[in-house]
């Protein structure tokens, strides 16, 4: 009977977190309910997790509304049903089209229309929802003769009087109006909360069929989902075997360039990594990143591969990263191992002038016509304490001066606010950390094997690329691992600098020749003397002084210097001890033998 529950992902409407929604259902001894957020599919999978853990049968759907005017509710009977609902919602959000009064003819979803006097033909999967407050009107309605098509509809949007008041404040904020001027039709009824079964039976004493029909609808919806399976794009070449063969081929081809004398040690490391990559199901993840940097190189875009992916020899051979893990003895298992639950991490930086074209390439290559397989990863802005205080001050009609005074004194001991100040401080705590609106993750992109609509709806911000309703944490939980495509202005400056050198000197500089730079005597001299102004990451006065003090002229020493200057290392005394042992070899004997064996490059000091 609870076919229309809202979480706080019904932005500026619902007040319940997913966990609190489930906890309230348990408190009222409810064994099945449907989460149907307003024009949002953000919380569906966390709800499934939480409900199943609590022993509650979860049903998922969407409440389709124009503003707050409910048009119909869609419930997914299965995963195909969720696909239908997400696609339908996405099409309307992207095209900014209002929903009609009639839903499409879905094959795997159930539709519930709000009760009205207007009578229209219903398809087999369509029903009319009757709230307890509408029972008296039902008696004289033509719908009363169609009992088999009527279900009890008890919406849930909050759990207490306090949260109902918070809901009204959210509605006022959404409409940018004073609380005293909030129209009744723009807010929920005070009764939109859970009732026990006994209470609902009492409220529908002469209409028990409504409860029975609602229960039958919940039983029709059996949404099974395997969270652990990887949902990313796979079988790029037709099958997993072909993908793996291609990854192996390209890795060894790149190894010929990276390691002109390919040793047995390097071969063993490559084979070990390839085996783990295949076992964990990350072959396509590597191939898509490889495709990405290949396209960038073809377009003469500079990139930098970062993250724990820099520990991979396979990534180094493919050109995704430019750091040699063999030379630096980097630990691949930090990136991928059989027991690591988190997905692998490649952070690929491009120039701010090139990033949008790289993203557009991913959409053009991997998006399918009339369906979505690529989307930018969504994120959520949340209400923060000070911003909520300001918004609530406006809703209560306080002058700007009083709002600023409240902000200034809010956390001061002994502060005694007036009546409105007390209300604002109380409800600021209630609203704090609630999601406010959908935003875009800084760099994440999702590429799914099945349509993205099996997992989420999408919206279309001014950026021009579709954005998911799920965030990074939900995506990882359901097996969709993001690709990180970042923007860095420094790469743009490097490119323009190299163009200037070529114009003025006629010299072409290849910045990917890392080994050449490591051995360049001029580079070593600049580092030794701390002449690094204009060099990213090592140009601060403290860093330049440290480079000169240590006489740094190797890559490992540069890495150590950039580590020991961090506040934690510096405050612990390890920075001072490292410099002492670096400049005075006889002091290195002070290191504990075990520490010296584990960390010989840093003289037994953890940096």
What are the functions of these language-model segments?
Residues 2-607:
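Alpha-helical scaffold/interaction cores of sigma-54-like transcription cofactors
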């Amino acid at each position: 009977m609870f076919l229309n529950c809202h979480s706080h992902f019904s932005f500026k409407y619902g007040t319940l977190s997913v966990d609190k929604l489930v906890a309230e259902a348990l408190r009222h001894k409810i064994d099945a309910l449907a989460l149907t957020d307003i024009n949002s599919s953000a919380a569906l999978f966390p709800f499934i997790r939480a409900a199943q853990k609590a022993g509650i049968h979860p049903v998922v759907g969407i409440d389709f509304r124009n503003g707050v005017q409910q048009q119909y509710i869609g419930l997914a009977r299965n995963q195909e049903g969720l696909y239908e609902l997400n696609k339908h919602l996405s099409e309307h959000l992207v095209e900014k089209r209002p929903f009609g009064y009639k839903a499409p003819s879905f094959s795997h979803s159930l539709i519930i229309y709000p009760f009205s006097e207007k009578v229209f033909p219903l398809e087999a999967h369509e029903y009319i929802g009757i709230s307890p407050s509408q029972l008296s009107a039902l008696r004289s309605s033509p719908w009363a003769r169609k009992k088999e098509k009527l279900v009890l509809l008890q919406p849930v949007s909050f759990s207490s009087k306090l949260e109902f008041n918070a809901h009204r404040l959210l509605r006022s904020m959404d409409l940018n109006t004073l609380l005293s001027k909030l129209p009744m039709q723009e807010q929920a009824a005070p009764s939109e909360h859970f009732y026990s079964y006994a209470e609902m039976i009492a409220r529908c004493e002469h209409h028990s069929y409504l409860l029975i029909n609602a229960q039958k609808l919940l039983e029709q919806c059996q949404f099974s989902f395997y969270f652990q399976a990887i949902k990313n794009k796979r079988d790029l070449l037709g099958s997993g075997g072909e993908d793996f063969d291609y990854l192996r081929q390209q890795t060894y081809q790149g190894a010929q360039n990276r390691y002109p004398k390919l040793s047995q040690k390097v071969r063993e490391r490559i084979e070990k990594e390839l085996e783990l990559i295949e076992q964990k199901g990350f072959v396509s993840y590597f191939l898509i990143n490889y495709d990405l940097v290949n396209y960038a190189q073809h377009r003469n875009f500079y990139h930098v591969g970062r993250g724990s992916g820099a520990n991979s020899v396979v990534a180094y051979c493919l050109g995704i990263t430019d750091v040699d893990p063999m030379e630096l003895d980097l630990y691949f298992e930090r990136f991928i191992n059989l027991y690591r639950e988190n997905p692998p991490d490649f952070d690929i930086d491009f120039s701010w002038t090139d990033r949008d074209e790289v993203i557009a390439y991913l959409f053009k290559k991997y998006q399918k016509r009339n369906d979505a397989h690529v989307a930018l990863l969504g994120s959520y802005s949340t209400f923060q304490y000070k911003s909520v205080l300001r918004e609530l001050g406006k809703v209560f009609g306080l002058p700007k001066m009083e709002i600023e005074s409240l902000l200034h004194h809010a956390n001061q001991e002994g502060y005694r606010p007036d009546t409105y100040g007390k209300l604002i401080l109380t409800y600021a705590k209630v609203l704090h950390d609630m999601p406010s609106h959908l935003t875009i993750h800084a760099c994440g992109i999702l590429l799914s094997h099945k349509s993205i609509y099996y997992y989420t709806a999408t919206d279309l911000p001014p950026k021009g690329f579709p954005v998911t309703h799920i965030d990074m944490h939900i995506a990882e939980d359901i097996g969709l691992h993001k690709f990180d495509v970042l923007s860095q202005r420094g790469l743009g400056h490097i490119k323009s600098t190299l163009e200037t050198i070529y114009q003025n000197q006629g010299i072409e500089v290849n910045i990917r020749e890392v080994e050449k730079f490591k051995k360049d005597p001029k580079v070593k001299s600049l580092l030794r003397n701390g002449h690094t102004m204009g060099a990213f990451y090592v140009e601060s006065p403290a860093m330049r002084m440290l480079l000169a003090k240590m006489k740094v002229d190797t890559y490992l020493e540069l890495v150590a210097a950039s580590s020991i200057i961090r506040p934690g290392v510096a405050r612990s005394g390890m920075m001072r001890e490292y410099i002492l042992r670096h400049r005075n070899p006889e002091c290195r004997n002070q290191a504990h033998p075990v520490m010296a064996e584990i960390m010989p490059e840093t003289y037994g000091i953890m940096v």
